[in-house]
Amino acid sequence: KSMRGSDPDAAVYYLARMLYAGESVTFIARRMMICASEDVGNADPTALQVAVSASLAAERVGMPEAQIILAQAAAYIACAPKSNAAVNAIASAMKTVEETGNLAIPVHLQDAHYKGAAKLGHGKDYKYAHDYPNHYVRQQYLPYELSGREFYQPGGMGYEVKIKEHMQRIRREAAKTEQKPQDGAEQ
């Protein structure tokens, strides 16, 4: 909770208490990886890499030096900007799946790489995003019944600000014009 609360001093102190009490390096590292994803998320995507690297390094190095590696990761995660947008996104998506069941995937997204797929319309009118400006094209990705739903809503902290701005910009630009593939793109 001290990492979530952005208190590196408390995070390192409680790490020391857990180590002193004999808690396993594996358990501590696992909790750090969870915190990096659950509480930091895309506000600082590097936090998960730091936690995973610390877990691997601490396991390989062993105690007593593993405590230094874990302290470095705990301090980093505690000081990182925070976001729980991924937690909220998956919770909302899981609830939607529970409520709506197994909705059909839009036919243009369905696998077209097998004999008979064309007869079923699979892949027909699929637009390859990399053929379009900004590598983005407006098309239905969610089941039609969920059209317009937003599960992931980036927050206003750290890197999520850039994610939000990027998504708004490419959607705005795509909405302004009729989208055609870039020159040289396959159709």
How should each PLM-predicted stretch be described?
Residues 1:
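Active-site flanking loop/helix segments enriched in acidic
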Residues 5-136, 143-187:
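Terminal-proximal interaction/regulatory segments of ATP-powered molecular machines
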